[in-house]
């Protein structure tokens, strides 16, 4: 399940790529009901990764929304599997999931979650040339020509709601 802003969506998509390698039947959905989607589905805008809009994906989205409201879906093999609260890598979650429909919900930020697909992740998150965006395309060529380029992603959400100082203490 993909939701939240660009940084989270990137980690979630990388996790999807890793799960798909383990189980080729794996599908990804965008949580259209999430209250935390800053600009909607950012992966298409930033990297050209389109949302799959097949009937199956639409049905999976509806089942996901309903399963969050009605627990009875568990009895027919619909499960929501959450990332551990401490965000630790859990190798067991990378195995093929139990029978039925399994929704994996979390940030999945540990690089260990997608170590089995490094090339696929790098390919997915390459910037593509943008039509009618001359300045962007000029910078893209500069970045591609420099072997020491660095990417910085500023987490907008971290600056929208500043937490009290105690929140940042260990």
Per-segment meaning from a language model:
Residues 2-4, 30-33, 153-154:
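Short His-Asn-centered micro-motif
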Residues 12-19:
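Short amphipathic alpha-helix
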Residues 2-11, 159-163:
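A short, glycine/small-residue-rich beta-strand->loop->alpha-helix junction that serves as a flexible
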Residues 25-37:
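A short beta-strand-loop structural module common to alpha/beta enzyme folds
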Residues 38-170:
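Secretory-pathway luminal glycosyltransferase catalytic domains
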Residues 23-27, 147-149:
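A general structural motif
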């Amino acid at each position: 399940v993909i939701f939240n802003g660009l940084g989270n969506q990137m980690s979630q998509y990388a996790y999807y790529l890793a799960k798909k390698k383990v189980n080729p039947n794996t599908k990804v959905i965008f949580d259209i009901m999430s209250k935390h989607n800053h600009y909607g589905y950012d992966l298409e805008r930033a990297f050209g990764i389109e949302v799959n809009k097949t009937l199956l994906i639409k049905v999976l989205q509806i089942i996901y929304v309903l399963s969050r409201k009605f627990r009875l879906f568990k009895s027919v093999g619909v499960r929501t599997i959450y990332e551990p609260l401490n965000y630790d890598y859990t190798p067991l979650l990378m195995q093929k999931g139990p029978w039925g429909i399994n929704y994996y919900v979390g940030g999945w930020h540990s690089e260990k979650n997608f170590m089995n697909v490094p090339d696929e992740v790098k390919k997915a998150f390459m910037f593509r040339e943008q039509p009618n965006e001359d300045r962007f395309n000029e910078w893209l060529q500069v970045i591609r020509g420099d072997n020491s380029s660095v990417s910085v992603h500023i987490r907008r959400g971290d600056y929208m709601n500043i937490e009290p100082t105690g929140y940042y203490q260990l």
